[in-house]
């Protein structure tokens, strides 16, 4: 009985440790999506990235580890607009309040488009 309880406790601790590392949120801001050109390694949370990196949206439409930015580009790194009232930047251009940053497949560039 004691061995099974000990085994259960160990599994529970490992599960909690693994989950908390994925949910751990590091300080700093994600850079703008179009500046994160590395699409690998993919990540789910900041805990998967090395010491000074965050898990951020990238140019490929997924998330990968990137160096944090001193600028606040919104909670999503300027990715496809932001639900809050913060400005969204697209290719270094500030989008209007009714626009979002979206990848244009024809020009292969990000551009501001209406929401």
From Swiss-Prot:
Gene Ontology BP, a term: defense response to bacterium
Q: Does the keyword Secreted apply?
A: yes
User: Which residues belong to the signal peptide in this entry?
Assistant: 1-21
Gene Ontology terms for molecular function:
serine-type endopeptidase inhibitor activity
* Record-annotated WAP domain positions: 23-69
Pfam families recorded: WAP
Q: Does the keyword Secreted apply?
A: yes
- Provide the alphabetized UniProt keywords: Antibiotic, Antimicrobial, Disulfide bond, Fungicide, Protease inhibitor, Secreted, Serine protease inhibitor, Signal
| Highest taxon listed in the record's lineage | Eukaryota
- State its location(s): Secreted
| Entry-linked InterPro entries | Elafin-like_sf (IPR036645), WAP_dom (IPR008197)
Which Cys-Cys disulfides exist here?
Answer: 30-56, 39-60, 43-55, 49-65
Q: Which organs or tissues contain this protein?
A: Expressed by the venom gland.
One GO CC annotation: extracellular region
Q: Which family does it belong to?
A: Belongs to the venom waprin family. Cys-rich waprin subfamily.
Main function = Antimicrobial peptides with activity against Gram-positive and Gram-negative bacteria as well as fungi. Recognizes carbohydrates in the microbial cell walls, and induces structural damage to them. Also inhibits microbial serine proteases, as well as mammalian elastases. Carbohydrates that are recognized are LPS, mannan, peptidoglycan, and N-acetl-D-glucosamine.
Protein name listed in UniProt: Waprin-like protein
Q: Which organism is it from?
A: Tetramorium bicarinatum
């Amino acid at each position: 009985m004691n061995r099974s309880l000990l085994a259960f406790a160990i599994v529970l601790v490992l599960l909690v440790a693994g989950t908390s590392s994925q949910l751990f949120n590091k300080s700093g801001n994600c850079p703008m999506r179009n500046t994160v050109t590395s699409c690998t390694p993919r990540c789910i949370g900041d805990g998967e990235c090395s010491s000074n990196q965050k898990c951020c949206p990238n140019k490929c439409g997924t998330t990968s580890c990137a160096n944090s930015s001193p600028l606040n580009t919104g909670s999503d790194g300027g990715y496809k607009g932001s639900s809050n009232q913060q400005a969204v930047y697209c290719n270094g251009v500030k989008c209007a309040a009714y626009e979002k940053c979206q990848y244009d497949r024809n020009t292969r560039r990000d551009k501001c488009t209406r929401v």
